[in-house]
Regions:
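Metallo-beta-lactamase
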Residues: 9-13, 23-137, 141-144, 150, 189-252, 335-357, 361-364, ...
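Active-site metal-binding loops of divalent metal-dependent hydrolases
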Residues: 131-133, 167, 226-227, 258-260, ...
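Catalytic core of the metallo-beta-lactamase
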Residues: 117-121, 215-277, 293, 297-301
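Active-site metal-binding motif and surrounding structural segment of the metallo-beta-lactamase
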Residues: 49, 141-188, 203, 274-280
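Acidic/histidine-rich helix-loop elements
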Residues: 132-150, 229-236, 287-296, 323
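Divalent metal-coordination and catalytic microenvironments
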Residues: 120, 130, 166, 221, ...
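Cap/insert and terminal regions of metallo-dependent hydrolase folds
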Residues: 25-43, 52-56, 161, 185, ...
């Protein structure tokens, strides 16, 4: 990290500590789940295809975001959602020797590196989603180490491919991108190519929602909508796009949801791209609901998205590494288990991976 970045992080850390010292000044704001559900249901699906950039800024035309920095400050100055001590202490074990298991596993697989970073091998090609190997995502510090080192990933044979969903620091880590092999091909939403070039990566494919590009023989990448937003210290709010992706090969389809709130787009994606095998969907940073509801999904909404996509299996992402909301980093499995019972979801279709776990995809039924 260079000197200017260290100063920026230090200033941000001081501000955050001041906010934390002043916390608990405001009560928890109530949230009307039924009203939110009605708002989602009333959105016009045609707007998923509408223009989504105006005056240099991107937006979600089916439901523009209303939350802003003032709401963030209120969250920081509010009472925190309370959890049991055992929930607060629950952390994931990291499985060792992933590199050895990669070498000994034939065929396709999905391996979890941590947070939203997954290593995927399809038809001999390697893909990684939103790689972050750094100790911090700007401010939040890792609770668990990565299940694979960046050096091991770089040493894997063949060309590497990366999917970047948006510009937030827990999904776009500059140091990790900079250290990738120079010939890594990187797929990004609109507006992020210049940043990738500045980090030393020239093989960059910039994509808009609903755009499909070839990634080789019998391989396609589809850029799809998500309900989120973007900002970095060096970039203004929403000057770059956010997205989810569908990776299509001759044998299977893998959907990577990036970061998103629940929205009508999941139904349209499931309708347009039937037969999704694995849906990698985020379950993190959902408390407090009054602040997080628009851009993040809780366990129930993640299962609703899984149902809308009509995918065969659901793999939860974006948990277990960084504490970004009020909820503990290890809460996702228990929250999903409860939500699955409530929604009558077959638990066999939910694959909760461990950090460093490798899931072979040779069989149509990974169980």
């Amino acid at each position: 990290m260079n000197v200017s970045n260290r100063k920026t992080v230090s200033a941000a850390a001081i501000l955050l500590q001041a906010l934390l010292l002043a916390s608990c000044l405001l009560p928890v704001r109530p949230f009307d789940e039924q009203r939110w559900w009605a708002q989602v249901e009333s959105a016009d699906p045609a707007l998923l295809y509408a223009p989504h950039r105006e005056d240099g800024r991107y937006f979600n035309p089916w439901m523009p975001m209303e939350k802003g920095f003032r709401d963030f400050l209120r969250w920081q100055l509010s009472e925190r959602t309370l959890y049991a001590p055992e929930e607060e202490k629950e952390l994931l074990d990291v499985l060792l020797d992933l590199s050895d298991r990669i070498r000994s596993t034939p065929g396709d697989f999905i391996a979890w590196i941590g947070h939203s970073s997954f290593l995927i091998r399809i038809d001999g090609a390697y893909w990684i989603t939103d790689p972050i190997f750094s100790e911090r995502a700007l401010l939040p510090k890792r609770k668990t180490p990565p299940g694979l080192s960046l050096d091991v990933f770089a040493a894997l044979p063949g060309k590497k491919n990366v999917l970047i969903s948006h510009s937030h620091y827990d999904h776009l880590d500059s140091e990790s991108i900079r250290r990738l092999p120079a010939d890594t091909r990187i797929y990004v939403p609109l507006g992020l190519k210049a940043l990738m070039n500045g980090l030393g990566k020239q093989d960059v494919v910039e994509m808009d929602w609903w755009q499909t590009v070839s990634c080789g023989d019998r391989c396609q990448v589809v850029c799809l909508p998500a309900q989120h937003w973007s900002r970095r210290i060096t970039q203004n709010t929403n000057t770059t796009l956010w997205a989810s992706f569908l990776l299509v090969s001759s044998d299977r389809k893998i959907y990577y949801g990036g970061d998103s709130g629940y929205f009508i787009g999941y139904r349209e994606i499931g309708r347009r791209y039937p037969g999704i095998d694995y849906a990698l969907l985020p379950v993190n940073a959902y408390h407090p609901r009054w602040f997080m509801y628009y851009a993040h999904m809780d366990a129930r909404e993640a299962l609703d998205a899984f149902r809308d996509l009509e995918a065969r299996y659901f793999i939860p992402t974006q948990w277990g590494t960084f504490r970004l909301g009020d909820e503990p980093v290890g809460q996702a499995p228990s929250a999903l288990s409860k939500a699955a019972q409530f929604s009558d979801t077959d638990p066999a279709r939910i694959i909760v991976m461990g950090i460093g776990q490798l899931l072979p995809l040779g069989s149509r039924d990974p169980k």
